[in-house]
Structures are given as C-alpha cells and as structure tokens.
C-alpha cells in the first residue's frame, strides 16, 4: 500500500495502549489522541483501496506484504475492518500474504544458529543491507527495509 500512495496512516485507537507499544513506536498517548477518528481513516483507506481493486471481482485482490505480517499485521488490519463493521476484509486482500520474514528463513537457515534473533534489522544485516539504526521502527523505513530484504532474497533465489 505504501507503493500505492498511502504513506503513513495514523488512526486514533479505540482500545487501551500499552506503554511498551508507545515506547517501541516512539509516540505518546497525546499524539495518538490527535490522530483522526478510526472511522474517518477507515473510509479514506477503503476509498483508496477501491481505486486499485474491485472488491466484487474474486480475481482482483491485493497481496499483503510485510515483515512478520502473517502473524502480526494481517490480524490487526483485519480487526480494523471488523471494528468498522466490515466483515469483508478478504474482498480486498488475498487470504495468503507474502511474509518476507518467512521467505528469508530459507536463505539464512545455515546462518540462523549464529544470529541473535530474526528481527528485521538482524536479517537485513545478515543479508548485507546497510541499516540506519535511527530510522528503525519508522513505518516508512520499515517498508523500505522489507522491500530491500525481499529484493535481496529474490535475487539470491534466481542465482541458485
């Protein structure tokens, strides 16, 4: 969706937010309270999706692509739709997503025992990608890193 012009999308949460989540994302509760209401963001989001996908066409869907999205982001995005009274999330998205963390496993399985973890930063470094540590956990930068990891492992696949 980043490549489709969505950019950083913020929405005011309608649930309790843990301090640890605020720290990781480097935002305050005050900043979150200043975000537009969730419904307003949902309407804009669906309008943007409809420019590219016909939700009534079973052959026209987006792939959700991310780093660790299959077990994390996909569920939150689907819950966002449900919270807005929309049970048709899969009218927009294929049920199978592209999780770059999972795809990276095959390419790093011989190095995995030497790696401290399998976080995006660690995987990127293991693949020889330069990291700007100050930008980690910034949504746009995380998208850029995910794309670089995907491109790197894709080129490795074709090299044999």
Question: What name fits each language-model region?
Answer:
Residues 10, 104, 121-124:
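Conserved protein kinase catalytic domain
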Residues 1-10:
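Single conserved hydrophobic/aromatic residue that forms the stacking wall/gate
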Residues 3, 100, 146:
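Ser/Thr-centric signal marking residues that sit
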Residues 63-70, 75, 80, 111-160:
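Acidic, Mg2+-coordinating catalytic module of metal-dependent nucleases/exonucleases
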Residues 22-107:
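Conserved DEDDh/DEDDy metal-dependent 3′-5′ exonuclease domain
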Residues 14-23, 117:
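Short, flexible, mixed-charge acidic loops at enzyme active sites
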Residues 16, 89-90, 131-133:
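Short hydrophobic "helix-edge" motifs at membrane interfaces and signal-peptide entry regions
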């Amino acid at each position: 969706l980043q490549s489709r012009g969505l950019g950083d999308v913020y929405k005011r949460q309608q649930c309790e937010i843990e301090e640890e989540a605020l720290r990781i994302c480097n935002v305050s509760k005050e900043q979150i309270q200043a975000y537009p209401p969730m419904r307003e963001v949902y309407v804009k989001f669906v309008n943007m999706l409809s420019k590219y996908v016909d939700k009534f066409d079973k052959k026209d869907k987006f792939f959700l692509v991310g780093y660790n999205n299959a077990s994390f982001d996909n569920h939150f995005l689907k819950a966002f739709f449900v919270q807005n009274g929309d049970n048709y999330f899969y009218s927009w998205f294929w049920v199978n997503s592209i999780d770059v963390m999972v795809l990276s496993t095959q390419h790093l399985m011989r190095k995995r025992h030497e790696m401290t973890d399998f976080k995006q930063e660690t995987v990127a470094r293991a693949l020889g990608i330069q990291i700007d540590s100050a930008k980690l956990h910034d949504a746009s930068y995380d998208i850029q890193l995910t794309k670089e990891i995907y491109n790197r492992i894709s080129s490795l696949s074709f090299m044999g």
